[in-house]
């Protein structure tokens, strides 16, 4: 399991006031999917808390060095699923003088080091759907796209059947 952690208060020397850049690093928790399902939620939360406590200036610098050393080959976390929620980061609220952004997207799908990250993203500031929901950005290997499409079609079909049954 991997999550993104804000490190703006951890780096030494501190970042300058008003710094506007990436201040997140991926943090990993070694946990098999079966263990995640079988364990109580409190046990998983304790693992996440412990992993957060291990992140310090040295961790951040090591992460930056690793990124620089392996930039050309791409960074991968192997068989890790990464989920990150960007809905409340505030990117959609920033006004550069011409209003809020129309879209907020990651620059790279490899931003978390995962081969298949999933981002929960807000709609743009002017988008009416913003109040009712959010976008899901999923990065898949090309070989998985067809199966993903089939799964989504099946999900939509089931949803349409359920909503039409409710109207009878």
Regions found by a protein language model. Give the residues of each.
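Acyl-CoA-dependent O-acyltransferases
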Residues: 1-168
